[in-house]
C-alpha cells in the first residue's frame, strides 16, 4: 500500500541498477503451470491514464509514492457495471441503529488475539505474493480463518482460497444472510520490500498485517451474534484477505472482476489497510484518530462510517486523502461497488517504515488497532442488518 520511505540517492541508484533482480519461479499446485511474467505491464495511474512499464518500473513508481492499478489482465474491470453507481446507487442508513446489540459485542474484542496472530504473520521472511513465503503465509492465514469459523460453530459459514496464477491465494470467508445482498470487509495479506522484493525481508507488520489481524478479530466476535451465526441477518457478510495488493491491486481486481461478471450484489466494501501506527501523530501533538479517506470513495458509505466511528469508537475521525488506486477498495469501486477506506491516521502521519525491513510489531499500537476492530465489527453488524431497498 501507499507511501514509502524516501530512498537515499545511492540506494536508489543501487536498486535501479538491479533492473530485473533474479526471482525464483513459484511452483504452483499440481495441475497448474508455472506462472510466467510478461516483459511489461500495463498500469493505470489515474482514470484513463495508462502506461507500459517493466516490473522494475513498477517498483520504481512505488518508491516514488506513486500508486496504480496493474490492469495487464484486467482492462475490462468495471465495463459491465459502468452505470451501476449512477443508476443503482445504494442508500445507507441515516444513523447506526443497533447500539444495544453492538456495544456488548465490542467488549469481546481482544488485543491479545491480534498480537498473537500478528507475531506469527510477521515471522514469515516476506509475504511477497510471488514467493514461496507468500504462499505459505496465505496457507497459514487460511487455517486461522477456518479455525475461527470452526471455533464459533459457524456451520453455515464457509471459507475458501481464491487462487491466483502467481501462487499466493486470496481468501474469502462468507457468512450467509437471508439475501445475496453482500457487505465486504477487506484487508490485504501480502507484504513487500521495495528495495529487493524477492530477496529482502518484509515483515509487513503495519502494511498490512495490522489490517489482516484487525478484521480477523472482528470476524471472531461478529460470529458471537446469534443472528449472524444462524444466517437470519438480512444481508450476507464477507471477509476478504487480498493477495498481491502491492503489485497493483491484483488480487482484489481478480475477485471483483469475477463478482462483476457473476452479477454479485455488493452493497458496501470497507478496506482496512494499516491500522496500527500512531507515533507520528502523537509526535506532531495531534490527537489519536481514525483516518477516513475522502477521495475516490463512495460518499454515502463514507458518511455512514463517520457516524459509526462517532458512536462506537473511543477516538475521533479525521478526514484525509490517499490518491488514486491506493488500496484494494479501489478495485471494488472500479467494478461499480460502493467502497470506502480507513487508515490509522491523517495520511501525512501514516507509517513511513512500510515496504522495508523495519515494518515491525514494536512500532505499532494494539490499542489503536482495537479502535479499528471496533469500527470493523460495528459496521459489519450494522450493515448486515440494514434494510437495503
From Swiss-Prot:
Keywords: Aminopeptidase, Disulfide bond, Glycoprotein, Hydrolase, Metal-binding, Protease, Secreted, Signal, Zinc, Zymogen. One of its GO terms (molecular function) is aminopeptidase activity. It is an enzyme of class 3 (hydrolase). Disulfide bonds join 322-326. GO terms for cellular component: extracellular region. Its EC number is 3.4.11.-. Binds 2 Zn(2+) ions per subunit. The keyword Zinc applies. Its cofactor is Zn(2+). It holds the Pfam family Peptidase_M28. Glycans are attached at residues 99, 156, 180. It is found in: Secreted. Zn(2+) 2 binds at residues 207, 246, 355. Gene3D superfamilies: Zn peptidases. Residues 1-18 form the signal peptide. Zn(2+) 1 binds at residues 188, 207, 273. Its main location: secreted. GO terms for biological process: proteolysis. Residues 19-89 form a propeptide. It comes from the Eukaryota. Monomer. Belongs to the peptidase M28 family. M28E subfamily. Extracellular aminopeptidase that allows assimilation of proteinaceous substrates. This is Leucine aminopeptidase 1. It comes from Phaeosphaeria nodorum (strain SN15 / ATCC MYA-4574 / FGSC 10173). The gene is LAP1.
Amino acid at each position: 500500500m501507499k507511501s514509502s520511505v524516501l530512498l537515499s540517492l545511492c540506494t536508489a541508484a543501487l536498486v535501479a541498477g538491479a533492473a530485473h533482480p533474479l526471482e525464483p519461479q513459484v511452483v504452483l499446485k499440481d495441475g497448474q503451470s508455472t506462472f510466467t511474467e510478461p516483459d511489461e505491464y500495463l498500469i493505470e495511474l489515474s482514470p484513463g491514464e495508462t502506461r507500459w512499464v517493466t516490473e522494475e518500473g513498477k517498483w520504481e513508481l512505488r518508491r516514488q509514492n506513486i500508486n496504480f492499478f496493474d490492469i495487464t489482465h484486467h482492462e475490462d474491470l468495471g465495463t459491465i457495471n459502468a452505470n451501476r453507481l449512477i443508476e443503482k446507487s445504494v442508500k445507507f442508513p441515516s444513523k447506526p441503529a443497533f447500539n444495544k446489540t453492538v456495544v456488548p459485542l465490542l467488549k469481546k474484542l481482544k488485543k491479545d488475539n491480534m498480537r498473537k496472530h500478528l507475531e506469527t504473520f510477521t515471522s514469515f521472511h516476506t509475504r511477497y505474493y510471488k514467493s514461496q513465503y507468500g504462499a505459505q503465509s496465505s496457507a497459514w492465514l487460511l487455517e486461522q480463518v477456518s479455525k475461527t469459523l470452526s471455533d464459533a460453530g459457524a456451520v453455515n459459514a464457509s471459507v475458501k482460497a481464491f487462487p491466483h496464477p502467481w501462487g499466493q491465494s486470496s481468501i474469502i470467508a462468507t457468512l450467509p444472510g437471508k439475501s445475496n445482498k453482500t457487505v465486504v470487509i477487506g484487508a490485504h495479506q501480502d507484504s513487500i520490500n521495495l528495495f529487493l522484493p524477492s530477496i529482502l525481508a518484509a515483515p509487513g507488520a503495519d502494511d498490512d498485517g495490522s489490517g489482516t489481524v484487525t478484521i480477523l478479530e472482528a470476524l471472531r466476535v461478529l460470529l458471537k451474534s446469534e443472528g449472524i451465526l444462524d444466517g437470519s441477518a438480512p444481508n450476507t457478510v464477507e471477509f476478504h484477505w487480498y493477495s498481491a495488493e502491492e503489485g497493483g491491486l491484483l488480487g482484489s481486481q481478480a475477485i471483483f472482476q469475477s463478482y462483476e461478471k457473476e452479477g454479485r450484489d455488493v452493497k458496501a466494501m470497507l478496506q482496512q489497510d494499516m491500522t496500527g501506527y500512531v507515533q507520528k501523530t502523537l509526535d506532531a501533538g495531534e490527537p489519536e484518530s481514525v483516518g477516513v479517506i475522502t477521495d475516490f470513495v463512495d460518499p454515502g458509505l463514507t458518511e455512514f462510517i463517520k457516524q459509526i466511528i462517532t458512536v462506537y469508537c473511543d477516538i475521533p475521525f479525521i478526514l484525509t486523502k490517499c490518491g488514486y488506486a491506493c488500496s484494494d477498495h479501489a478495485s471494488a469501486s472500479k467494478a461499480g461497488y460502493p467502497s470506502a477506506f480507513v487508515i490509522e491516521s491523517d495520511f501525512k502521519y501514516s507509517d513511513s517504515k512500510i515496504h522495508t525491513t523495519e515494518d515491525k510489531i514494536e512500532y505499532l499500537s494494539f490499542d489503536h488497532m482495537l479502535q479499528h476492530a471496533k469500527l470493523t465489527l460495528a459496521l459489519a453488524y450494522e450493515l448486515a442488518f440494514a434494510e437495503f431497498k
